Design a protein with these regions (language model features):
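Specific transmembrane helices
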Residues: 80-81, 86-90, 109-134, 332
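Short alpha-helical catalytic segment bearing the HExxH-like zincin motif
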Residues: 34, 105, 157-162, 324
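Residues within membrane-spanning alpha-helices of integral membrane proteins
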Residues: 34, 38-41, 77, 84, ...
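Hydrophobic, aromatic-rich transmembrane alpha-helices
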Residues: 121, 168-177, 181-192
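Alpha-helical transmembrane segments in multi-pass integral membrane proteins
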Residues: 4-32, 42-71, 88-100, 126, ...
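Divalent metal-coordination and catalytic microenvironments
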Residues: 37, 85, 110, 164, ...
Length: 388
C-alpha cells in the first residue's frame, strides 16, 4: 500500500468570515444528496427503457442519436456507488468509537436492505423470471459473480447490490481499525489499482471468450467508485476545508475528467470493448461524480440551497431503492404482455411507443416502490430504534 498523507495544508485555505453565514457542509440531513439519488435512479430507468436491448438500426438518425445518448443512463449506478461510498464512510467514521459500532451498523443496514431485496427474490422465483441457482447465489450476495459459477446473470440490477453488500461486509472493519489517513491510503490504492484489474480482466475475458461486459460487474472492478466517495468523506472530516477549497477541488476534478477524456478519445476510452476503455472509461465519470457531490454540498449549505433541492427528485430519491429493484421486473412484464399480443391493437410509431412504454414503466415502478416503502420497508425499518 503506498504511503500517503492528506495534503490538507496544501489544499486548504483559511476559513473565511463569510463561511459563517452558511450552514456546515456536513449536516445530519443533506437533502441535496437525496436529489442526486433521484437523478441516479431515473438515469437507470432511462437506460433500460431507451437503450438496453434496443435495436438502434430501426430508427432514423436523429432519434438514434437520442437513444444512443440514453447509454449514459447506466452511469446512474456509478453515481450510486460514489454516493454510497461517501455516505457510508462518513457514517462509519462518525460512529467508530461507539461500543455498539458493528451491531448498530449491520442491524440498521439489514433492516433497510433485506425486506425489498428478499421480496424481489421471491417474485423472481414466483414468476419464473430467474432460475433457482441464480436466486440462491443472489441471496448469498454473489449476483455479480454468477458467471464465475457458470450461471447467467438473470436479473441484472442485482449485480450492483452485491457490490454494495461486499462493501458493507468489509468496510466497517477497515474504518474501525485504521486511522482516517490510513483509510485514505486504502482508498487511493483502490482507485489506482482498479483500472489495472479491469485491464487484466478484459484480456482474460477476451482470451477465454467470455462475455466481456460481465467483467465490469465484478466487485474488484467496480470498487473505485465507492473508494472515490469514501475519499471525499475522509477529506471533509480530516482536513475541514473551507468552502473555497472545496470549490477549487470540484473544479480541479472536472478539469481532470475532461483531460482524461480528451487524451483517451483517440484510444477508445468510450468503448469498453477496447483496452483503454475497459480500464479507464469509468475513471473520469467517478471524478465528475465526486465533483457533483462536492458542488451539491456547497449549494445545499448555502443561502441558495433551494437550487440544489427538487421536491420531485427528492421523492424519487426517497423511493430510489425500490424503484431500482422493481423496475426491471415491470419492464420485463410489459415486454411479456407485448409479446403475447396485449398491445396488438395499439398502433403507434415505434419511437412514440418507446415513450409510452417509459411512461408505463415509470408510473408502475413508482407505484410499486411507494407501496413497498410504505407497507413493507418503513414498518420494518422502524424497528432499528428498538434493536440498536
Amino acid at each position: 500500500m503506498p504511503r500517503i498523507t492528506l495534503s490538507c495544508q496544501l489544499l486548504s485555505t483559511p476559513s473565511l468570515a463569510s463561511d459563517r453565514i452558511f450552514e456546515p457542509i456536513l449536516r445530519p440531513v443533506m437533502p441535496e444528496l437525496n436529489t442526486l439519488r433521484g437523478i441516479a435512479v431515473l438515469m437507470v430507468l432511462v437506460y433500460h427503457a431507451f437503450y438496453w436491448s434496443i435495436d438502434l438500426s430501426m430508427f432514423a438518425p436523429a432519434k438514434r442519436l437520442f437513444l444512443t445518448a440514453a447509454w449514459t443512463g447506466r452511469l446512474g449506478v456509478n453515481l450510486f456507488f460514489v454516493l454510497s461510498g461517501f455516505l457510508i464512510t462518513g457514517l462509519l467514521v462518525d460512529t467508530k468509537t461507539r461500543q455498539d459500532y458493528y451491531k448498530r451498523f449491520y442491524i440498521r443496514r439489514s433492516l433497510r436492505i433485506l425486506p425489498a431485496f428478499l421480496l424481489t427474490l421471491v417474485v423472481l422465483l414466483a414468476v419464473r423470471a430467474a432460475p433457482l441457482n441464480f436466486v440462491l447465489l443472489s441471496a448469498a450476495y454473489l449476483a455479480n459473480l454468477t458467471p464465475l459459477f457458470g450461471v447467467a446473470i438473470a436479473y441484472p440490477v442485482l449485480w450492483s447490490l452485491a457490490v454494495e453488500e461486499h462493501f458493507y461486509l468489509v468496510w466497517p472493519a477497515v474504518v474501525r481499525r485504521l486511522s482516517n489517513r490510513a483509510i485514505a491510503a486504502v482508498c487511493v490504492s483502490i482507485v489506482a489499482l482498479s483500472p489495472i484489474t479491469r485491464l487484466i480482466s478484459f484480456f482474460v475475458a477476451r482470451r477465454k471468450g467470455w462475455v466481456s461486459y460481465e467483467i465490469f460487474d465484478y466487485t474488484w472492478n467496480s470498487a473505485d467508485g465507492l473508494a472515490c466517495g469514501a475519499l471525499l468523506a475522509i477529506f471533509l472530516r480530516e482536513c475541514r476545508p473551507s468552502r473555497k477549497t472545496i470549490a477549487r477541488l470540484t473544479g480541479l476534478l472536472v478539469v481532470l475528467a475532461i483531460v482524461i477524456w480528451t487524451v483517451g478519445l483517440p484510444f477508445g476510452i468510450f468503448s469498453r470493448h477496447l483496452p483503454v476503455g475497459a480500464a479507464l472509461q469509468i475513471v473520469p465519470w467517478n471524478f465528475g461524480f465526486v465533483a457533483l457531490i462536492g458542488f451539491s454540498l456547497l449549494l445545499g449549505s448555502s443561502p441558495r440551497r433551494r437550487w440544489s433541492r427538487s421536491p420531485v427528485l427528492e421523492f424519487f430519491g426517497d423511493i430510489s431503492y425500490g424503484l431500482y429493484l422493481y423496475h426491471l421486473l415491470i419492464l420485463n412484464g410489459l415486454g411479456w404482455l407485448d409479446y403475447h399480443g396485449f398491445f396488438a391493437n395499439l398502433h403507434f410509431p415505434l419511437f412514440l411507443g418507446l415513450w409510452i412504454r417509459f411512461g408505463l414503466l415509470l408510473g408502475l415502478s413508482v407505484l410499486a416502490a411507494y407501496l413497498s416503502g410504505r407497507y413493507l420497508e418503513q414498518p420494518i425499518l422502524h424497528l432499528k430504534d428498538r434493536w440498536t
